[in-house]
Regions:
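Glycine-aromatic micro-motifs
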Residues: 1-105
Length: 105
């Protein structure tokens, strides 16, 4: 199983069900040292950027997914984002999608 932290369009249960192919419950967590910005990816989608670790964090949901579902999320995110392992406030590490540099507007 793979940990995935989501903070944008995948917070919407309808979008998650369409991408994951099943209904899954996540748990709330946060990513310290980042800030969320709306519309910075391709001028439309949210993204997160490094920020002051003492004052900034991004709230989101943490899911434990089979690798097959994570591969579907990779396809959904496409070339707009890349996946990186980061540490969450809970102490768990998870994959997080960060904006691809060439997509930031």
């Amino acid at each position: 199983m793979e940990n995935l932290f989501v903070y944008g369009t995948l917070l919407d249960p309808k979008v998650r069900r369409r991408i994951f192919g099943i209904s899954l419950d996540g748990c709330w967590d946060a990513l310290p040292g980042y800030k969320k910005e709306e519309g910075i990816v391709a001028g439309t989608y949210p993204g997160i950027m490094p920020s002051d670790p003492e004052r900034s964090e991004v709230a989101g949901l943490l899911f434990s997914l089979p690798s097959e579902i994570l591969a579907r999320v990779d396809t959904y995110e496409g070339s707009l984002y890349y996946r990186k392992t980061l540490n969450l406030r809970s102490g768990k590490s998870a994959w997080v999608y960060l904006p691809a540099e060439n997509q930031i507007r």
